[in-house]
Structures are given as structure tokens and as C-alpha cells.
Regions:
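Outer membrane beta-barrel translocator domains of Type V secretion systems
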Residues: 320-321
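Extracellular beta-solenoid/beta-roll
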Residues: 1-15, 23-25, 33-34, 40-47, ...
Length: 321
């Protein structure tokens, strides 16, 4: 059933119960409280919904924004105890604050930028496209065990506060902000930081799209790599203190990952202790290996784990012909 209470220039409240609803036009809701209530079934929006109150999605219901061709907008608050699905027809910025215990899915291939406070406690699955948590935005609740799953063909990056575990599947990418946003360099505290565990079955991309060097990606949790996973970095190959991208893991590391190094303008030099590229605060059990030879000038660099548990690029002179 569709129940709407009309009040002057718009609806005071809208309640939907049924199996499937599609709203392709614009809707003004001028009520308060849970003025848009999706009790059961699935509601797909492909127009502009202006809600002065709150939208609530019940446990067994779903709300889809966009129909794959058209883009939907939703203002007001959003309590998600069911499932919210993004299937927008174009790149989209979502500024609505989302709470609740429900799950979120992104199924389109466009870019979704989150700018609000997303404190829902359910899981998030990114099936495709790019998802960005912008500066000042949040995703997840501190101490939560919820997971963001980055599937094949999907990319996730943050300049805000992410309090979820991250599972990168084969073909998925967890990226540094400027690996996705070009030469956009930010210094906010949440940039390139995950407050949770990261399992990597795909790619952890630290290298900037503009070939700059010096990204520091931080995992405030454990890191687990699986066979075939990659960590991709830029370095200016030289002596110990030469610029390089860096991965900081405050917890422990497990499993295995390949490390791919792109030399950006380095001529090579003799290292003494080596260029630190990965630091680990807890138990350092992961096995990291170079994905391909790393050579600069007359110097070949190899990857070694030191007694501190951290990983370093160390150089040696290549044999002359």
C-alpha cells in the first residue's frame, strides 16, 4: 500500500508497504519525524525527493537511489535498518547523514562521493565504480566490526574518517586519495587512513596518479595479504632517506603480498640501512616480495625485513658488462 497525507504544497508523510515501488518523479515531503517510511519491499527512486523530516528503511525493506540510468537525490536524515542501494546514472555526491543497523550496496560504475556522517553499523559492498569518503565525512562507528568489501572492478579511497574493516577482493582496489584524485594532496588527519583491519586479495594502491612520491597510508589494525595481492608504490630510488611512499600498519601483518615499486626520477645510490617502505607495530609475519626487479642506474634494490619487523629497500651495485 502507498499511504500519503497531503498537506498544502507537499506530503506531510509517505508510507510504503508492498513488494516493489518505483518513483520516477520529484516528491516534496514537508513533515517531521519519519516522514518517509519504507516498511516492506523495495522502493526505487529516480527523481528528487526533498524531505524536511527523516527517511526510515525498515529491517526487511530496501531503498534504491537511481535506476541505473537516472540519478536520484534525497535530502533530510536517513535511518537505514534494511538495505540502501546506490545505482545512480551518473557521478553522485551523497550528503545525507545515514544512521541505523542496515547494509549498503553500490552497484553502478560511477563515482560516489560521501560527504556526510555515515554512522550506520552494517556492512558495505562496493560492486563497481569508485567510492570516496571526502574530507570531514565519516563511514562507520569506532569499535564496529562492520566490513567494507571492495569487489572486482571497484575502487575505494578516503580523505575522511573510516571506522570499518576493509576486504579487498581480487580485482578490487583500496587506493590512496591522490591515486584516484590526481594531484589532489590533502593533509587532514583521516587522509589515507583505515581504522580497522585490512585483508588484501586485490590491490593496495599507494602510488599517486600524478607520479608524485611520499604518500603514507596508515592501517590502524592488522593487515592480511593473500596469494596474488599487490601493494603498489612510487619511490625515488637513492640512499636511505630518499623519498618513497610508505605503508604504516599499527597492528600485525599476516599472509603474503607482492610489492610493486615504480622509480620516479631516482638515479640510484648505495644504501646503508635501506629505504623503509613498510612499518609494522605488532607481530610482523607477512611475507612481502618484490613483484619485479627494481633497478636504478647501476643499482639493484631488493626488499628485506629487518630485526625490527619493518621492510626496507636495500641497494647493491649491478655487475658491469
Amino acid at each position: 500500500n502507498f499511504v500519503g497525507l497531503n498537506e498544502g504544497d507537499g506530503f506531510a508523510s509517505v508510507k510504503m508497504e508492498g513488494e516493489s515501488w518505483a518513483l520516477s518523479g520529484d516528491l516534496d515531503i514537508i513533515g517531521s519525524g519519519d516522514s518517509l517510511l519504507i516498511e516492506t519491499g523495495a522502493l526505487t527512486l529516480s527523481g528528487a525527493v526533498s524531505n524536511t523530516g527523516n527517511t526510515r528503511v525498515a529491517k526487511d525493506a530496501s531503498l534504491q537511489l537511481g535506476d541505473g540510468e537516472k540519478t536520484a537525490t534525497l535530502s533530510g536524515g536517513l535511518t537505514n535498518n534494511g538495505t540502501v542501494i546506490f545505482n545512480q546514472g551518473s557521478d553522485f555526491t551523497f550528503a545525507t547523514d545515514m544512521t541505523g543497523s542496515g547494509n549498503v550496496e553500490k552497484v553502478d560504475s560511477n563515482t560516489l562521493t560521501l560527504t556526510g556522517k555515515n554512522s550506520y553499523t552494517g556492512d558495505t559492498v562496493l560492486h563497481g565504480g569508485t567510492t570516496l569518503v571526502s574530507t570531514g565525512a565519516t563511514l562507520g562507528v569506532k569499535g564496529s566490526n562492520a566490513t567494507v568489501t571492495v569487489e572486482n572492478g571497484a575502487t575505494f579511497a578516503t580523505a575522511g574518517e573510516v571506522n570499518n574493516n576493509i576486504a579487498i577482493l581480487s580485482g578490487g582496489t583500496l587506493a590512496a586519495w591522490n591515486a584516484v584524485q590526481g594531484n589532489s594532496t590533502l593533509s587532514a588527519s583521516g587522509v589515507d587512513t583505515i581504522n580497522g583491519n585490512v585483508t588484501n586479495g586485490g590491490t593496495l594502491l599507494l602510488s599517486a596518479a600524478d607520479n608524485s612520491v611520499g604518500n603514507n597510508f596508515t592501517i590502524n589494525g592488522d593487515y592480511t595479504g593473500s596469494d596474488g595481492s599487490q601493494i603498489v608504490m612510487n619511490s625515488t630510488l637513492g640512499e636511505d632517506n630518499s623519498p618513497t611512499d610508505h605503508l604504516t600498519i599499527t597492528g600485525s601483518s599476516f599472509g603474503q603480498s607482492g610489492v610493486s615499486i615504480t622509480n620516479i626520477g631516482g638515479a640510484g645510490a648505495q644504501t646503508i640501512n635501506g629505504m623503509e617502505i613498510v612499518s609494522i607495530g605488532g607481530s610482523s609475519e607477512a611475507q612481502l616480495t618484490l613483484a619485479k626487479p627494481v633497478v636504478a642506474g647501476a643499482w639493484e634494490y631488493n626488499l628485506y625485513q629487518h630485526s625490527d619487523g619493518n621492510w626496507y629497500l636495500e641497494s647493491k651495485a649491478t655487475p658491469s658488462d
